[in-house]
Regions:
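Bilobed "Venus flytrap"/periplasmic-binding protein-like clamshell domains
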Residues: 14-39, 53, 99-169, 175, ...
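A structural signal for short loop-to-beta-strand junctions that line the ligand-binding cleft
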Residues: 21, 84-91, 124-125
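A short beta-strand-loop structural module common to alpha/beta enzyme folds
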Residues: 43-57
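Hydrophobic/proline-rich hinge and linker segments of small-molecule sensing/allosteric domains
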Residues: 86-113, 196-213
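Pocket-lining segment of extracytoplasmic ligand-binding domains
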Residues: 153-245
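Secondary-structure end/capping motifs
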Residues: 215-284
Length: 301
């Protein structure tokens, strides 16, 4: 056995005995879906250590290979699939759940925009991350529109920044789609509606990845994640306190609306339609030179 083989075997042994590391967002859909896995309620799964982070940070953690299981944006997959594989469960896809482009209701142009990207020409725009699905959809939708600046902010700070006038527009995700009117903002574009109208496919937002060097088989990990989601559906009350503990939004009705929108049948299994949606998004983006071509297929044997 070579020294590199000894090192690899030692690392695998340490990983097996140390349990699993999981990195997800603190948003209700993630804490709801992964409550059972994180709390040792899925039989046969070693102890799980959880890290919570904003989606832009999660994408960066995956690029550095820091976690065994990690939630990322589908838009980031072209940079991640050499070290990770896509699991067919636990992610966020759906219909009517896309990112929104928001502006102040006080702006005369906002009321007349109705999905016209030209309203953003010369605008200062806040986004949740450069490798997020939200920003990739934004770039496809607003192709040819020259904005003034693009700045990355933690998603929970985008609406206050637009409200305060520091930005002309904000690209929002998560529970922001339920609460933006309270900030005096209006939606000038629903990028999910735009995507569904253009493709007929669901919106591929967040993916769950597993490290390729894990000793567990990918099928076993997918089954464990699927079991966690199924447990959440079977007993929603079990995760309620943990979900509220980590949520940016504490209103129970908003939290429940968030879960209802983002945790669905695609969270149990991507299926043919889920894979087709992700492939279509990344193929369109690669054609426009917005992302590299995928290094390998999303669906692996």
């Amino acid at each position: 056995m070579t020294m590199s083989q000894v090192t690899a075997a030692g690392e695998a042994s340490q990983r097996e005995h140390a349990g699993l590391t999981l990195a997800i967002s603190p948003c209700p859909n993630d804490t709801f879906a992964f409550h059972a896995l994180a709390h040792g309620l899925v039989p046969g799964v070693p102890p799980v250590s959880v890290t919570f982070a904003d989606i832009d940070v999660l994408n960066a953690r995956a690029a550095d290979g820091l976690d065994d299981l990690v939630k990322v944006s589908y838009a980031a997959l072209p940079w991640l699939l050499d070290g990770y594989r896509l699991l067919p469960a636990g992610g966020a896809l759906g219909r009517g759940c896309g990112p929104l482009v928001l502006m102040s209701a006080d702006r005369p142009a906002a009321a007349d925009a109705q999905g016209d990207a030209a309203v953003l020409r010369g605008a200062r725009v806040a986004i949740p991350g450069t490798r997020t699905t939200a920003y990739l959809l934004f770039r496809l939708w607003a192709a040819g529109i020259d904005v003034a600046t693009i700045d990355v902010l933690p998603f929970e700070k985008i609406m206050p920044a637009v409200q305060a006038g520091r930005y002309d527009a904000g690209l929002v995700i998560h529970e922001s789609r339920f609460t933006y009117p309270s900030y005096g903002l209006v939606s000038v574009a629903d990028l999910g509606d735009w995507w569904e109208g253009a493709t007929g496919l669901p919106i591929p937002l967040g993916a769950i990845l597993a490290r390729r060097d894990l000793p567990a088989q990918a099928g076993d990990l997918a089954a464990a994640v699927r079991a966690s989601v199924a447990a959440a559906f079977a007993d929603p009350a079990a995760s309620a306190a943990w979900v509220l503990e980590h949520s940016q939004e504490l209103a129970p009705e908003v939290v429940q609306a968030h879960i209802d929108l983002y945790v669905n049948d695609f969270s149990l299994d991507l299926g043919d339609e889920g894979y087709a949606a992700a492939d279509e998004l990344l193929a369109r983006a690669a054609t426009e030179n917005l992302v590299p071509a995928l290094p390998r297929p999303l669906r692996e044997a």
